[in-house]
């Protein structure tokens, strides 16, 4: 019989459930994700670093977990990073039995192998309503030993998830992109490599000014963007030039801060595969995959920048664009994984801008 554990919130609420995964205690920021599928991608997304993820889908684990060591083009084939990034997992019903052609193990066994606790048999609907009404809060999964509450937003999480040295993918390709790794998802790299781009992946605080490249990309990542001061300073220098710049999620926030805008923490964030965004100036709507707890205040955008996309649920900024330079960023995830790929065309737009720049400066 599975052991009993508790989900404890900072306000004192305790919810009892059953343990799966590692029988251990862990603390972090409690957030909810409304995606129906894609838990292996979500669990390995570096943007979830330091967070306890509540899945609102009623059954989790029924299609198991694929091989997390399988590699394609030197990138994990089925995961978004090389390890589970969440601090803990909360589900309503955990399916220990699984069935999928690509699965090799149970979700619980995978969590246990990386010492990540899970709790099931709890009312995730009630928990989600609590987070929606009160906002994301600190919490902990308590097993045999209690632990202190932990606020991940006080730490520089980007430093923890970024690569430690320069890594190159698809070397020799004609187009070269510097990718600032703030916790990049693997599918972003795949999207570039699949378009025959050489990706030069650099650490979050790396001085890339000495490298030869044609365009700059700033990745997604966890935590408060204001803590990434070296990255912001490097981007400030890049904004002075004319090379194309593209940012996703945290990258959107960092480019905005470098340009002189500000960011703020959302009440409970956007974490789902069904966030509607509108292309500003049109009636065009896209359904997007999102995972972020901070947003850009587009009421104070600096001169030369304008809002690119807007969230149709709460009206928040979903991207910015420069009026004359090839610079644009989005808060959502056009690479998806999981989620819809309706906006993956943005990679093509960026590469076209890079080609124009490269040809003009040949």
Language-model segments: residues:
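Proline-centered loop/turn at the N-terminus of a beta-strand
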Residues: 117, 176, 244-246, 262, ...
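Active-site glycine-centered loops adjacent to acidic/histidine catalytic or metal-binding residues
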Residues: 123, 249, 292, 333
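Beta-strand-turn-beta hairpins that frame and shape the catalytic cleft
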Residues: 171-177, 282-285, 322-327
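Active-site-proximal beta-strand elements of phosphoester/diester hydrolases
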Residues: 176-181, 288-289, 328-332
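Catalytic beta-strand/loop cores that center a nucleophilic Ser/Cys/Thr
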Residues: 284-325, 361-362
